[in-house]
Amino acid sequence: VLQAGGFTTSIRAGMAFLDWPLSNGSINPPGWLTEIDKFAEHSHRLAATGLGLLCLAIAALHYAREPRRGVRLAAYALAGLVILQGGLGGLRVLLDQLNIGGDGNLKAICFAVGHAVNAQLTIALLAVIAASHTLAWRQANPAQPRERLAAKIAAGAVFTVIIFGAIMRQNHFTSWVTSGSLTELFLPAGDGLPWLMNLFHRSGALVAGVAVLIFAATGERRASRWVPLALLLGVQISLGVLSIVLPLNPHVRTIHLVVGAALFSTLCAHAALVHRAKSSEA
């Protein structure tokens, strides 16, 4: 779902269909298998529908079979987030300038940013629920306060970077690196709000990266935490650099989004494990 949605944004195909939830009034609209913009948007809608049904099934199964109250509540929250996600996506389409007219497109962009950010939260919560059914969760040892603090700081920093990235992508604010200058990787060209969002996203990514590494190096079971987080962080930073030096390649930006979601969800799962470790509940 993230790949399909990210690719749709990368090629600016979010309004390939002006209606919602159907696409041109159909679940099998003409041209969606042959026209790339229609394929991107309609495949995103189909995949999102499948994920939504899966999340509702997860919530129902936890209601029927899960004895731990905290995990059940997380499953219910997942169902709520996925329903909200569908609504945000629909409003992004229905309130677009192409549908309601007007001089600006602020309403649609706000819902698009919310849709992008909520997608990350949905996947992260799904990862936490999955982690709650692992052996590591059941065998968790008490965590130190500094470890829990490091987890919160890392998760908050990464989520902040995600918000700036969503604002950049949905407004098409990305400042490309065309001069070959290393400085331009960290100090984007331009001015105004686009420049500010690029600066916050890039500098924030460096701060978040350090926070992730600090958390990865704390506490017990360091290898199981350090290896996936460090690997995902390294790949994500590399993709971030490629994203701004290859402006004509939508696939790199899409993969950057997907790996970012993998990093955030993995981080949230480990953070939940740390907070689970301080209590015998859930």
Region spans (language model):
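Polytopic transmembrane helical bundles with strong interfacial aromatic enrichment
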Residues: 1-282
